[in-house]
């Protein structure tokens, strides 16, 4: 990066070998603003003044903590300048003010904002055995073995993480939310498999993350996902055929089912039976609604309380 190239020779050696002096100065400009290292932390200062927000320096964007002034690196949850905010005439760059909300941004090890737009796979260092879990704060796994894995993220035009549902290239994706129970986490990961959102189950392709619709055979069971992606439950009419999907799990049922105080029979394909049908050598009759006829006569034939035709 440009500012590293401008470090004075002594400061460069000290920086890379970790032998930090009390104060190391580099990247000076004509107005006296400069990068300064103090006790292993980097600041942008002019005398006793510290930058404490966004700053564009030599065409690169940095963020300095709004309280301490320390240059940030890695994932940061920080405010983004509002539309129409003031851009002041600062030396060697601009300072942006007016912050309506915070978003997640990614800065490299030199503190430079990574101006990603669209999909980006980032290598993430984590401290748990399978990679950072959704909803896990970084400090939650400080004592665990460090692992690395790649995670797919989507960045908007402001270079911040998108979260929630994303429609891209005619497909829907779901990006993990960063706020859970009022607390902010590092989210934004492209989800895969089953997800539960707003009291509804959805299924995302395990490889691409694309939201699935229609009939899906998963874990040796059939499910139906509506055009919205929502998992169907209960009775479902597909064309002219009725199916029953478990009210809780959504898996397609076959054979005998008891719903609303009524018996129904579903073929091995899941389709609901109507009319006369035979099961294990016994004849039964189901009305056009699929309800099993019991203890009555159908076309002069008697069916008992179990629905079986009695000769």
Where are these regions (language model features)?
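Extracellular adhesion/carbohydrate-binding repeat motifs centered on closely spaced tryptophans
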Residues: 2-311
């Amino acid at each position: 990066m440009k500012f590293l190239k401008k470090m004075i020779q002594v400061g460069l050696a000290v920086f890379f070998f970790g032998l930090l002096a009390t104060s190391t100065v580099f990247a000076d400009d004509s107005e006296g603003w400069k990068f300064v290292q103090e006790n292993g932390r980097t600041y942008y200062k002019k005398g006793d003044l510290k930058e404490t927000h966004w700053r564009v320096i030599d065409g690169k964007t940095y963020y300095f903590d709004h309280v301490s002034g320390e240059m940030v690196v890695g994932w940061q949850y920080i405010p983004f300048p509002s539309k129409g905010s003031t851009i002041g005439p600062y030396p060697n760059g601009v300072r942006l003010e007016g912050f309506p909300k915070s978003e997640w941004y990614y800065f490299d090890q030199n503190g430079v904002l990574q101006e990603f737009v669209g999909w980006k796979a980032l290598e993430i260092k984590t401290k748990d055995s399978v990679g950072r879990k959704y909803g896990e704060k970084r400090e939650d796994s400080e004592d665990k073995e460090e692992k690395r894995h790649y995670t797919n993220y989507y960045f908007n035009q402001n270079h911040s993480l998108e979260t929630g549902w994303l429609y891209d290239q005619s497909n829907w994706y779901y990006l993990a939310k960063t706020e859970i129970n009022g607390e902010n986490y590092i989210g934004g990961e492209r989800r895969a498999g089953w997800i539960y959102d707003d009291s509804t189950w959805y299924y995302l392709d395990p490889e691409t993350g694309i939201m699935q619709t229609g009939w899906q055979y998963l874990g040796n069971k059939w499910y139906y996902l509506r055009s919205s992606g929502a998992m169907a439950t209960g009775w479902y009419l597909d064309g002219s055929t009725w199916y029953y999907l478990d009210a809780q799990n959504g898996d397609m049922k076959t054979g005998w089912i008891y719903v609303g105080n009524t018996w129904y029979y579903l073929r091995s394909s899941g389709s609901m039976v109507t009319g006369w049908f035979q099961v294990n050598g016994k004849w039964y009759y189901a009305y056009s609604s699929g309800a099993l006829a019991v203890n009555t006569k159908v076309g002069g034939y008697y069916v008992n309380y179990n629905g079986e035709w009695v000769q």
